[in-house]
């Protein structure tokens, strides 16, 4: 920034650097709060460049031009506890949650788009708190995460999931609870002179023409895209979330 300002004495704008230590997990006390503050102040931001580790193997390989949305759901099925020798006197939530997870996993959300991978659901937890081998449990729970492209919103995904849950639980005469957490909606930054300029600068410095991509997880661009067009470019991310991350 200092070099740029020294070389461009007539520059009449402002350049701000935002450094946050709250980017993972719920990420409520970092970029999100700054974005809310800037909205209240009615600050106009022309462009944001997020320093996310976007490159798979070499610096210059990839620029992120958008991100998939992320929705996590925790399902709880309430059946009826009973003895395994008398299943007609119980209602096994384990069996019901297996039916639900099987149907959820087999949803064909879409085939992907020009810029996005197909929407994907992964089951991340299955919990049945039961220490007895001969007892049908009362409750079974599971957690899943969906990474969705811009053909969907978190709202449309929830509707689809809720319809399946209602159908299967009605059939099995069981009750269910579901809690959702949305980490971000899918977004795509339109290509313009600024995005082309950044791509050309990366090529000039690294001698590699970067691929434009929307792969990977969520980043703080999910907040910044609400106030400004943004791209992501940074270091190589081969060791992200691993021991000795570098």
State where each predicted segment sits.
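Acidic/histidine-rich catalytic neighborhood of metal-dependent amide-processing enzymes
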Residues: 1-66
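Metal-dependent amide/peptide-bond hydrolase catalytic core
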Residues: 53-58, 65, 71-246
